Design a protein with these regions (language model features):
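GST-like domain detector, emphasizing the conserved glutathione-binding G-site
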Residues: 2-233, 312-454
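Short amphipathic alpha-helical segments embedded in low-complexity Lys/Glu-rich regions
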Residues: 90-94, 235, 264, 298-304
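Acidic, serine/threonine/proline-rich low-complexity intrinsically disordered regions
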Residues: 201-208, 259-273
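C-terminal and inter-domain tail/linker signature
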Residues: 230-231, 281-283, 292
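GST superfamily/GST-like fold recognition
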Residues: 237-262, 285
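Catalytic lobes of large eukaryotic enzymes
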Residues: 269-284
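Acidic catalytic cores of enzymes that act on phosphate-bearing nucleotides/polynucleotides
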Residues: 293-295, 326
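Extended amphipathic alpha-helical segments with heptad-repeat/coiled-coil character used for oligomerization
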Residues: 295-313
Length: 454
């Protein structure tokens, strides 16, 4: 194909900047570079209202796929702690820099580096330790939000410890459910143990012991959430605190993996009725821009979970599992086909802001009274989404083309070592013969995204 018919990337960048959404995103990008502006997963500096250079540096993963880095960043953003940020590859996605390994030989993320008065550097690992120290070093007396009970609040600390232990119990049940083969279903019906013994095939009402254990543990979490007047674990605050962040990064991954591998949609009408507190808690998170900046979609999670935790095992409610996995993989004939549907049946997009607030404002899109965007004009929202996608692609299109061209016939795999996520191999070379064509196709796509028409 002709590689000259499509407009150049520089022309496309100019076209993107001329749109209302692109102009707003350019301005926001400039603010972020100074440490201010809205939350962003790849920010290297957060100053908020401070003008001083931070003396602490957080090392975390690039994409926000590490749940422990994610919960740490959520506390930093909610509490507005000035901090330097360095992005380091997770073990599954590439080598860690020698400079980082010299400071943190284990390679663990996140890691906090604190500059001491004598010039030495103190290294702190483990997300919960980092979060507790950050809260202690930035007290309410200096205008920061409280993230933990006060020292004299013994009742609050007892509640925090109980909830933290429950989170570990929930995590354990999730691992048992998703990353191990399921045993026979419990119950006397045709799908249960008796059905297996008698050879009769079965319905979906019975469930395995691991599924029951997971749902029973979720019921304990539900009780804790519904015991407070607001959506959060500690009802005396009108914002999420550290225990909410400890939970949400893994609950987010539970939602995706349970739907994909087990056919369990915890956000469906059925489970909203069973777990109203959990769903109200998730709804509240999904209206907060700092959470959405680090939140991933279901497809991303079911791809990034196996390199970190191991493969998921199919099971659970089989008919629903097939339905959800095909939807998430784009193989249901609808979810990845043009014209794209306005919303996603498994992971609705408009419970909170689907784009950065600056982009929505530039597009003239306002939230509903409840903070959702469910009544927004679909065509207006689609145009804003296209323009943001065009803005992102135009700013990095040549690199996207080279990355995509690694899938060509002569694309080189890394002969020296392998990583847990082979598609993210940083050493794999593109098939140079197809780079110009791939680049041209992407420029045509970008131009289409930036058009004003439908």
């Amino acid at each position: 194909m002709s590689t000259t018919a499509a407009e150049s990337w520089s022309t496309l960048q100019s076209a993107s900047s001329s749109t209302a959404v692109g102009s707003a995103l350019n301005n926001e990008q400039s603010l972020r570079a100074t440490g201010k502006g809205s939350p962003f997963v790849q920010s290297n500096l957060r100053l908020f209202n401070s003008s001083e250079k931070p003396k602490i540096t957080l090392y975390r993963d690039h994409a926000g796929w590490c749940p422990y880095c994610q919960k740490t960043m959520l506390l930093i953003e909610e509490k507005e702690i000035p901090i330097n940020i360095e992005l380091v590859a997770m073990r599954s996605y590439g080598d860690k820099p020698a400079e980082f390994l010299n400071m943190v030989p284990s390679g663990l993320l996140p890691a906090l580096i604190v500059e001491q008065p004598d010039g030495r550097k103190r290294v702190i690992t483990e997300s919960q330790v980092i979060m507790e120290l950050l809260d202690r070093w930035h007290p309410t007396s200096e205008g920061y939000k409280a993230m933990l009970p006060s020292e004299e609040d013994t009742v609050g600390w007892s509640k925090f410890d109980t909830l933290a232990n429950l989170e570990r119990e929930l995590f354990s049940w999730w691992c048992t459910l998703v990353f191990r083969p399921e045993g026979p279903r419990l119950g006397g019906g045709s799908g249960g143990l008796m059905g297996m013994l008698t050879g009769k095939g079965g319905g979906e009402k019975e469930m395995s012991g691991s599924m029951k254990g997971f749902l029973d543990c979720l019921s304990k979490v539900e009780s804790a959430l519904t015991s407070t007047p607001g959506p959060w674990f500690f009802g005396e605050y009108d914002y999420p605190t550290m225990i909410d962040f400890i939970y949400v990064s893994h609950v987010e991954r539970m939602l995706a993996s349970a739907a994909y591998w087990k056919g369990l949609d915890l956000r469906s009408a059925e489970y909203k009725a069973q777990f109203p507190g959990l769903n109200a808690w998730l709804d509240a998170f999904e209206k907060r821009e700092c959470y959405l900046a680090f939140k991933s979609d279901y497809y991303t999670h079911v791809m990034d979970i196996p390199p970190q935790y191991g493969p998921g095992f199919d099971g659970g409610f089989e008919d629903k599992r097939k339905e959800f996995s095909q939807c998430i993989n784009g193989r249901d004939g609808k979810s990845w086909k043009l014209p794209l549907p306005h919303d996603d049946p498994v992971q609705p997009l408009y419970r909170g802001p689907p784009l950065p607030l600056c982009a929505l404002s530039a597009a003239g899109i306002e939230s509903d009274a409840d903070g959702t965007y469910e009544s927004t004009n679909p065509e207006q929202m689609a145009k804003a989404c296209r323009h943001m996608a065009g803005w992102k692609l135009s700013s990095n299109g040549d690199k996207v083309a080279r990355f995509a061209a690694r899938g060509g016939v002569d694309g080189a795999k890394n002969p020296r070592k392998s990583f847990g996520a082979p598609l993210a191999d940083p050493y794999a070379n593109p098939d140079q013969s197809v780079v110009p064509s791939v680049d041209a196709v992407l420029r045509i796509v970008c131009a289409a995204l930036l058009e004003d028409g439908e």
